[in-house]
Structures are given as structure tokens and as C-alpha cells.
């Protein structure tokens, strides 16, 4: 064995149990006694407030004996006093019999409310059934009574009256006359239909009937007469409306009024401009004389005698049917007439083509003169 281990072993001394206890617990705790441990064992040790500490040291800073003897209590918030409860009431509240009685009262009140609601519903159902059944027949049987009651007749009569369309006062055009005839037929059919039918679904059918519209002309229908000119319409009307009616048709402004001479001048100028543009491709008379009228023979055959006018779909259909009927009757005369129905695109293309031909004619004349 080495000598170092022997020396360390000889230096170690045995330790007594008393020495271990004194080293683990300090001496100042042992000197405090058992009261120290009791105070630590208490859950919340009471601490003195500032008032209590001042009360204990009052003799140090107060001279009069009266103040020293007087004890100052801390100010506490006022506690609201509860109303006193009788002991009998306490026992009654605490007993289970009262709770059971309260539950029974609640259930009885709920049952009464439900019964009241059921009675109200029954009354409503009975009243609706009585009003709908009329003379006591049920809806399930679907057998109508032989005679209607006065109330239902009055109601249906008022409903039929509400469907009527009364004519407005004023002048009537010949086209409006046919519509009034259609309205009368509709009224008569509606009245008869209402008196015959009994169910609400039939009445709904009457209300869904739309007003009659003007039936467009088909190929088999007779053609409408052509529209009269403005001058003819103005001559047919009364002399009082003469200065007002043409102005409305021309200027579309009812407040603007023009004299007859001004209107005729405007019509003449418009016709002249249209003729110059479509017949002579917008050229002045001097240019036409220089170029020669023979260059416009083809233009005159295609464009000169065409009647350009705007028309609605109904009038165009009627005119086409009129043309077809007249073609069947007069085949020879149809070949001599100028064809109708050239579109605006084709018309513009012809105008552009003739303008181009005039330009080429000018260039050829310049080349020939040179």
C-alpha cells in the first residue's frame, strides 16, 4: 500500500451523532424556542395595522392623558341591513314540500297556456272551415251546391267588373276600333267564364289572360292599305289643327311651329338633295355636263327610281305579301317594274362603285387631252 493512503486514513476522526445534529441545525434557531415554530405553523399570522401601531406608541407623541385613554377605532364601510326573515318562513323555504308545490304550479300554468293556444287554433280552423264550406258542405267531397250564395255572386261580379277596360275619351283611329272590338269580346268571354267556373284556379286563369295585340299580317292575310302622305293627312284634318300637326310630324318637337311655305321649301330642298346624291352620285350640275350624262345610264337604271323608305316589321311583311299577290296576278307588269328590297349595304356599294367609275373617267379624259 502507498504511504499517502495510510496518512489520510490516520487523519480521519470518527464523528459523533451530536456533532452531526449541531452542524445541520444552526444554533440561533435552537435558541429561539418552541414559540418560533408555532408562529410559523399558523396559516395567516395576524399583522398589526398602522392605526394599531400608532395606538400602541401614542404615549410617545401625545401629552394629554385624555387622548391617550381614548381608543381610536378604524373606519369600516357601512353594511346594509337585510330585512328580517321570520323563522317560520325560513323553515317553509327550506322544506321540500314548497318546492314540489312550486313545480306543480308551474306545470299547471304551462298546461293552461297550451290549452288556451289549442282552443284558439281550433276556433280559427273552425271559422275557416265554416267560411270555406259555405252552406255546410266539406271540401273533401268536392260537390258544389246547386245554387250560389249572394256573397259569392257579388264577389265574382265585382271581380269581373275590375277586369273590364273602359275606353278613353278622345279621337279614335281606325286601328283602335279593332282593338276595342277585341276588348269587348274579351270582356264578354271573361264574364261568361267567371259565371260558369267555381274554383279559384279558374279565376287565376282569367287574370292571367293577356290583352289582345295587333295580329301581324301573314302571306294569306289581306294587305294593309298604303300609308297616306303628310299633305293628304293635313288636308283631311280640321283647319284648326293645321299649323300644329305637320310641325309635330316633321320636327318631332310639339312646341316648334313652322309656316306652310317653310315646310314646302324644306321638303323641296330635301328631295333635291336626295335626288342629286342618289341619282348623280353627289356631283354638281357643272361636273355632270363636263362628264356627260351617258356615263350615268347604268346608275339611273339601278338607283334613280328606287323608293327608299323605312317601315316596321308588320308593314314590310304586308308589303311583301302584297307584292307576292300582285306577282301572281300580273306576271307581265312585274318584269317591267324596278326590283324592290335592295339593302342599304348594296345601295352604298353601288354608289361607291359609280363614284370610282367617275374618278376613272376623269383620269382617262385627262390622259386623252394630254
From Swiss-Prot:
<dbReference type="Pfam" id="PF14161">
    <property type="entry name" value="FAM110_N"/>
</dbReference>
<feature type="modified residue" description="Phosphoserine">
    <location>
        <position position="238"/>
    </location>
</feature>
<dbReference type="InterPro" id="IPR025740">
    <property type="entry name" value="FAM110"/>
</dbReference>
<feature type="modified residue" description="Phosphoserine">
    <location>
        <position position="301"/>
    </location>
</feature>
<protein>
    <recommendedName>
        <fullName>Protein FAM110B</fullName>
    </recommendedName>
</protein>
<feature type="region of interest" description="Disordered">
    <location>
        <begin position="237"/>
        <end position="256"/>
    </location>
</feature>
<keyword id="KW-0206">Cytoskeleton</keyword>
<dbReference type="GO" id="GO:0005829">
    <property type="term" value="C:cytosol"/>
</dbReference>
<dbReference type="Pfam" id="PF14160">
    <property type="entry name" value="FAM110_C"/>
</dbReference>
<keyword id="KW-0963">Cytoplasm</keyword>
<feature type="region of interest" description="Disordered">
    <location>
        <begin position="317"/>
        <end position="337"/>
    </location>
</feature>
<dbReference type="InterPro" id="IPR025739">
    <property type="entry name" value="FAM110_N"/>
</dbReference>
<keyword id="KW-0597">Phosphoprotein</keyword>
<dbReference type="GO" id="GO:0005739">
    <property type="term" value="C:mitochondrion"/>
</dbReference>
<dbReference type="GO" id="GO:0005813">
    <property type="term" value="C:centrosome"/>
</dbReference>
<dbReference type="InterPro" id="IPR025741">
    <property type="entry name" value="FAM110_C"/>
</dbReference>
<feature type="compositionally biased region" description="Basic and acidic residues">
    <location>
        <begin position="326"/>
        <end position="335"/>
    </location>
</feature>
<feature type="region of interest" description="Disordered">
    <location>
        <begin position="127"/>
        <end position="151"/>
    </location>
</feature>
<comment type="similarity">
    <text>Belongs to the FAM110 family.</text>
</comment>
<comment type="function">
    <text>May be involved in tumor progression.</text>
</comment>
Amino acid at each position: 500500500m502507498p504511504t499517502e493512503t495510510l496518512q489520510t486514513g490516520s487523519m480521519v476522526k470518527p464523528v459523533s451523532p451530536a456533532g452531526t445534529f449541531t452542524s445541520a441545525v444552526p444554533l440561533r434557531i435552537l435558541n429561539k424556542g418552541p414559540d418560533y415554530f408555532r408562529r410559523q405553523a399558523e396559516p395567516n399570522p395576524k399583522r398589526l395595522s398602522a392605526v394599531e401601531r400608532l395606538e400602541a406608541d401614542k404615549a410617545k407623541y401625545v401629552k394629554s392623558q385624555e387622548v391617550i385613554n381614548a381608543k381610536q377605532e378604524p373606519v369600516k364601510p357601512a353594511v346594509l341591513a337585510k330585512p328580517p326573515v321570520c323563522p317560520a318562513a325560513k323553515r317553509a323555504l327550506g322544506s321540500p314540500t314548497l318546492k314540489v308545490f312550486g313545480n306543480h304550479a308551474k306545470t299547471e300554468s304551462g298546461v293552461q297556456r297550451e290549452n288556451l293556444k289549442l282552443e284558439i287554433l281550433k276556433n280559427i280552423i273552425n271559422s275557416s272551415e265554416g267560411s270555406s264550406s259555405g252552406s255546410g258542405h266539406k271540401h273533401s267531397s268536392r260537390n258544389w251546391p246547386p245554387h250560389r250564395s249572394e256573397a259569392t255572386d257579388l264577389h265574382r261580379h265585382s271581380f269581373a267588373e275590375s277586369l273590364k277596360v273602359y275606353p278613353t275619351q278622345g279621337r279614335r283611329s281606325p286601328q283602335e276600333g279593332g282593338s276595342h272590338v277585341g276588348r269587348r269580346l274579351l270582356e264578354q268571354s271573361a264574364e261568361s267564364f267567371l259565371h260558369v267556373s267555381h274554383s279559384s284556379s279558374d279565376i287565376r286563369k282569367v287574370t292571367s289572360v293577356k290583352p289582345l295585340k295587333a295580329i301581324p299580317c301573314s302571306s294569306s292575310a289581306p294587305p294593309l292599305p298604303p300609308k297616306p302622305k303628310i299633305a293628304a293627312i293635313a288636308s283631311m284634318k280640321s283647319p284648326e289643327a293645321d299649323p300644329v300637326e305637320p310641325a309635330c310630324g316633321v320636327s318631332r318637337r310639339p312646341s316648334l311651329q313652322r309656316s306652310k311655305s317653310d315646310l314646302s321649301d324644306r321638303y323641296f330642298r330635301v328631295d333635291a338633295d336626295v335626288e342629286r346624291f342618289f341619282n348623280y352620285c353627289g356631283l354638281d350640275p357643272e361636273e355632270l355636263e363636263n362628264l356627260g350624262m351617258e356615263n350615268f345610264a347604268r346608275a339611273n337604271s339601278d338607283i334613280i327610281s328606287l323608293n327608299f323608305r323605312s317601315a316596321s316589321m308588320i308593314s314590310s311583311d304586308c308589303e311583301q305579301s302584297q307584292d307576292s299577290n300582285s306577282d301572281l296576278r300580273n306576271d307581265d307588269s312585274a318584269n317591267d317594274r324596278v326590283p324592290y328590297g335592295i339593302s342599304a349595304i348594296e345601295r352604298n356599294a353601288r354608289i361607291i362603285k359609280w363614284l370610282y367609275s367617275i374618278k376613272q373617267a376623269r383620269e382617262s379624259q385627262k390622259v386623252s387631252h394630254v
